[in-house]
Amino acid sequence: MYLEEKLHKIKKPIMVLGTSSGAGKSLTVTAICRILKNLAEQPIPFKGQNMSNNAWVDWEGGEMAYSQALQAFACGVNPSSEMNPILLKPQGNSVSEVIHLGKSIGTTSAKNYYQDWFIPGWEVIKKSLNSIYKKNPNCRLIIEGAGSPVEMNLKHRDLTNLKIAKYLKANCILVTDIERGGVFAQIIGTLELMKPEEKKLIKGIIINRFRGDLSLFEEGKKWIEEKTQIPVIGIVPWLNDSFPPEDSLDLLENKSRFTNAEIKVGIIKLPSISNFSDFDPLENEESILIEWIRESQNLKKYDFIILPGSKQTIKDQMFLEKTGLSHDLREYSNNKGHIIGICGGLQMLGTFLEDPFLKEGSKTFSEQKIKGIGLLPLRTTFFEEKLTRQISSESLWPCQSKINGFEIHNGQTELDNTQNSLKINPIFKDLNLGWYKENKEGGTIAGTYIHGIFENDIWRDQYINLIRMNKKLPALKKRTSSYKNKREKIIENLANEFNKHLNLSSLLN
C-alpha cells in the first residue's frame, strides 16, 4: 500500500483528541486547518468515523458529515467522502445507517456494529488514507477524534481515535472544556487510561472555553505541565455564539441574537431532524429571528415556517399527526401562512407517503402507507436505492436565478392526480426538484429536494422579500456580501482567535 511505504516521508499529521464529547474538537480542527492554510501548508481534514444526520454530498455524489465538509472549506479544498470514510446516520432505536466512502451499504444495531463492521471499517479507513496521500503527497492531515479516546469498554474496538493516531504516528493534541468543570481530573484521568506508547503521542494540551482573565490560569497550567510532562500549548477563551458547534443545532437552540429582527421564522423540531445546516444562512440574516416549534400551538406569530429534512419521514409525519402539528400547519396555511418544506419536509407536505421497503420508520403494514399533511398534491414512495448528488439548476420562483445545492433522499415524488383542486407549479427548470402553490387566501406552500437552498443569495433574498412584502416591509437592501463570503469570514475569524492563544510550532516538525 502506497501510504505504508511512504509513512516515514509524510508530514506529521496533527490529531485532535478530546477528553469528552463536546470538548471542542471540531472547531479546533477547523481553526487549525485555516491557520495552516494561511501558512501556505496543504492541510486536509480527516475523521475516520462520524455519527451525524447533518450530511453533505461531494461532487461524486458521496455522503459525508457536514463538519468535515466545513473543515475542507477551511482548508480551501473541495470536500470529499474520503475525508470521512465512515458515516453513521442514526435512525432511532439504536439502529444506524452505515455509509462507507459516501455510499450506503446497510444498517446495523449498536450491539452488532463492532462485531460486524469493525474489520471492514478499518479497511475502508486505510483505503481512504492511502488515497488521500497518493493524491496529495505533500499534505498535512488534520485529524479529528470522536468522543473520548479512553472509553475502556469500547477502546479495543475504537476506529476513530488512538488506532488512527498509532497507525499514522500522529502528533496528538488533547482538548478539554474548562466550562464544564473538572478540567484537571479530565486531563489526568484521560492520560492515566492510556498505554505508555499512546501517551507518548500526546504532544500538547489545549484548555478550551476559558472565561475571564487568562493569567488567572497560570498556576493551573504550571500544575498540568508538571504533572503530565506535556506542554499546555493553548488556553482558548470562550468564543461567543459566532462560532457554532459541530452540527450547529446547539446554536439554534439558544438563538436570539437578532433581537430587532423584522421576520420571525418557526422551524418544526422533528424527532428525526436531519441537515439542520440548511438553516445556517438564515441565522446570519440580521432581519430574521429563528425559533423552534416543539409542540402544537397557534402558529400565527410566525412569518414563515420551515418543515425540515428527516431521517425517518414516516415516523416524523406520524409525530406531526399525533401532536396536532399537522392540523396547526393546515390552519396556518388557511390563514395566509407561508410554509416551505425541505426534502423530508417536502414529502410530508404532500397527500400520501408510501414505504414498501420500510426505509423511513415504518414498523407495521398499516404504517407503510399514510396520509401526509395534504397541502401539496404530491405522493412519495420510498425505495431502497438512495439518490445523492450535487445540483445545479435554475429557479423559476420566486425569481429566476442560478441554484446550487445537493440531494439526499430515498423517496421519489410525483403529482397526485386525484387532487385536481390543488394546482401547483414547479420551482425549478428541473421539474422534480420542487413545487409551490399560491393560496387563494394569500400565502404560499413550497417544497424542495435541494439541501442548501438558502445558501443561494439571490433566491434567499427574493423568498425573504416575498415574506416582507406580505408584511408591507421594504425589500432587503442589495447585499454587499454573499453567504459563502460570510462563512469564509467566520472561519477566518475563528482561526485568528485560536492563533492568538495557540502555539503549534512544536507539532509542525
Swiss-Prot record:
GO terms for molecular function: ABC-type vitamin B12 transporter activity; catalytic activity. One of its GO terms (biological process) is cobalamin biosynthetic process. Gene3D superfamilies: 3.40.50.880, P-loop containing nucleotide triphosphate hydrolases. Residues 262-459 form the GATase cobBQ-type domain. It comes from the Bacteria. The active site is at C343 (nucleophile), H451. SUPFAM superfamilies: Class I glutamine amidotransferase-like, P-loop containing nucleoside triphosphate hydrolases. InterPro entries: Class_I_gatase-like (IPR029062), CobQ/CobB/MinD/ParA_Nub-bd_dom (IPR002586), CobQ_GATase1 (IPR033949), CobQ_synth (IPR004459), GATase_3 (IPR011698), P-loop_NTPase (IPR027417). Keywords: Cobalamin biosynthesis, Glutamine amidotransferase. Pathway: Cofactor biosynthesis; adenosylcobalamin biosynthesis. Disulfide bonds: none annotated. Pfam families: CbiA, GATase_3. Catalyzes amidations at positions B, D, E, and G on adenosylcobyrinic A,C-diamide. NH(2) groups are provided by glutamine, and one molecule of ATP is hydrogenolyzed for each amidation. Belongs to the CobB/CobQ family. CobQ subfamily. NCBIfam families: cobQ (TIGR00313), PRK00784.1 (NF001989). This is Cobyric acid synthase. It comes from Prochlorococcus marinus (strain MIT 9312). The gene is cobQ.
